[in-house]
């Protein structure tokens, strides 16, 4: 398995920010339509991360025009242009699947506050 590990290590991204479930992300995705390509931003909160290494994925959920939309991205995929962390969420679970059933203010995620002293 050491040969597979070295092949996998060559295809890992190094520009992935640290994020976890509950964080709000902007995922910039390259969309190819025929000969044209454009970057589309998908903004939502992270439901969870699965897997490890080159097979690692994360699921982002947003509500668009009253309809919940979930999209699962491979972390090390070449179609992802960049990942931006907008806010850090204060949650106590690794998987937020219960958020699918919540509506309105109940579906709000508290923002994690940073208590480091600013000097």
From Swiss-Prot:
Record carries keyword Ribosomal protein: yes
Gene Ontology molecular function, alphabetical: structural constituent of ribosome
Annotated GO biological process: translation
GO (cellular component) term, any one: cytosolic large ribosomal subunit
SUPFAM superfamilies: Translation proteins SH3-like domain (SSF50104)
Keyword Iron-sulfur included in the entry's annotation: no
Domain of life: Bacteria
Keywords, in A-Z order: Ribonucleoprotein, Ribosomal protein
A Pfam family reported for this protein in Swiss-Prot or TrEMBL: Ribosomal_L19
Disulfide bond residue pairs: none
InterPro entries cross-referenced by the UniProt entry: Ribosomal_bL19 (IPR001857), Ribosomal_bL19_CS (IPR018257), Ribosomal_bL19_sf (IPR038657), Translation_prot_SH3-like_sf (IPR008991)
Sequence similarity: Belongs to the bacterial ribosomal protein bL19 family.
PANTHER family, A to Z: LARGE RIBOSOMAL SUBUNIT PROTEIN BL19M (PTHR15680:SF9), RIBOSOMAL PROTEIN L19 (PTHR15680)
Function: This protein is located at the 30S-50S ribosomal subunit interface and may play a role in the structure and function of the aminoacyl-tRNA binding site.
HAMAP family: Ribosomal_bL19
UniProt name for this protein: Large ribosomal subunit protein bL19
